[in-house]
Amino acid sequence: GCESACCKNLWQHGKKEKISSIGIIDPKQRKSWMIDATPDFPQQYRKLTVEHDTELAGIFLTHAHIGHYTGLIHLGREVMGEKNVPVFVMENMEEFLKSNGPWDQLIRLKNIQLNRIKKNVNIKIGDSLFIEPFLVPHRDEYSETVGYQVTGQNNSLLYIPDIDLSLIHISEPT
């Protein structure tokens, strides 16, 4: 297996952390949303829907790297057999999913329903709950990369899954 420090620690100590994903819960509507569908999707889905007694109302994807979208496969006919789960994606991510298997099968069989979103455009997901995608500098081999700002009635949070700091130019004050 992998010999990097983080993998060696896992193999030696056996503690496996979950891959980063955010759950958004609207307790009034009893609905939830996920940001990213990771390889740990089954546990993350269960935590949102069973432990918090909500219905999954949608999944917002950040980009086309393995830890951020591959959990979608669990929605297909070989596992959950879901129907029309809303998946919110930017333009290049949409094309990636439509053009590559097994993701295109999820679309054809209507396990997922793609909803194209645009950068810097707020999306209302609850009475006073909004989510807004914004572009993030990262390796964009297959799709653009976005972060999300989630805004509620009293608080907001910023989720940036991956970022390449070397691609950010910081100007010196003049």
Where are these regions (language model features)?
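A short, active-site helix/loop in glycosyltransferases that binds the activated sugar's phosphate group
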Residues: 92-102
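A short helix-to-beta-strand connector/capping loop
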Residues: 83, 107-113, 127
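Structured loop/turn residues at beta-strand edges in well-structured enzyme cores
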Residues: 54, 67, 110, 127-129
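Ser/Thr-centric signal marking residues that sit
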Residues: 62, 161, 174
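Histidine-centered active-site/metal-ligand motif
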Residues: 63-68, 138-140, 169
